[in-house]
């Protein structure tokens, strides 16, 4: 349907309320990392098993034995995998083994820069060229033509403007562009702007017309 425009992002999960709402267990951080490592191994293993072959996984949390007869993906050997997070040891290690792209929230340019470097070092430790992993960052977008409009949009997504200033690209188009530039200077090759209020079409239009042209 998408002509191959598919990416898969996997993480350990962090919002306990979301898990509880759907009846999904929320184990300890170490166990969530163990499960994520197995999940990444299973997904990539299934995708790369030749047609008619057998994929076997005997892990601590998952066990399966299936034929590799899944529909082949358009992207080969498989769709890009995104791994992200701020963990300083296991997250970079998993990204080095499995990821096509590493992603982090750009709350702090200094921390993002340091985390990107940890991922590069983890790649070198397993004999992988760090250039094979793209570095990306994400920021909540809250853009307005003036201060009053920015404050209104902040209220509409339930976040005080003071809180947004650290976790978001918030402000006028010029201020949002400057915040994005900080992320790029920290090492982000790709930037994702998270839009919280999808019904605010004027917000999307403003970003599309007055921000995105200056980020290409």
What are these regions (language model features)?
Residues 1-216:
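Active-site-adjacent structural elements that line small-molecule/cofactor binding pockets in enzymes
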